[in-house]
């Protein structure tokens, strides 16, 4: 994903992956 698959919970990815990273 956008963040390379890490720290999604504390990045913009949290808006799209509220359950955490999957990729």
From Swiss-Prot:
Major location (coarse): other
Record key words, sorted: Disulfide bond, Fimbrium
Disulfide pairings: 8-21
InterPro entries per UniProt: Pilin, Pilin-like
Top-level taxon: Bacteria
GO process annotations (BP): cell adhesion
Subcellular locations according to the entry: Fimbrium
One GO CC term, this protein: pilus
UniProt subunit comment: The pili are polar flexible filaments of about 5.4 nanometers diameter and 2.5 micrometers average length; they consist of only a single polypeptide chain arranged in a helical configuration of five subunits per turn in the assembled pilus.
Protein family: Belongs to the N-Me-Phe pilin family.
Protein's UniProt name: Fimbrial protein
UniProt lineage: Bacteria, Pseudomonadati, Pseudomonadota, Gammaproteobacteria, Pseudomonadales
Record gene name: pil
